[in-house]
Amino acid sequence: QSQANHDSSLATATHITDTSPKEKARVHGRDMRAEFINGSNLRNDINIVNCFQDSGSYGVGGAVIQRVTLSDLEGNELDWVVGGEPVRLVIECALKRDVDNPIIGFQLKDRLGQVLFGDNTFLTTLNEQLGFAGGRSISGIFEFFMPRLPSGEFVFNAAIAEGTQMNHIQHHWAHDVLLLKVRQTSFSDGLVGVPMNYIAIELSEN
């Protein structure tokens, strides 16, 4: 089983000289305004509905997605999350035959079908030449900060393929496996709100 490397922004610093809340947020990758936002009516509450059992799909079936979950970093499955907080997306797959160089990935789309963001395991495992026997199970694991989302509904797609980014066999692509419902937002512009590690106005020296 191969686990995607964690984004460097999720890594914990080993030495912090300034322990103020703003500096802690800057080091750990959390929005410096999180405490203020989450304590106000701007908190970006996101309800999560697991729709995997009802999702449409396609693919040749050499590997099949069996479960998709969104959890906290301790593995507790979530039915709601606050935008800007760290989450773990796990895509569990059963191999129906031998699979070489599997690629497991996801997308988050808005109600118009626009892909807001996504990722896969290809680059993480590029130099590993992975191969797994049929009958085994593997999981794609992704840890990231949930972006702040505008009000509305959003869906995750999940997929497992075999090969390379440009030339692959699509074993299983599952549509709309997780539904996100958002009622309140705090970001000011764009399709998604990225947690800001640091925001300031500084006086420049002449």
Give the label of every model feature segment.
Residues 1-206:
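Localized sequence-composition bias
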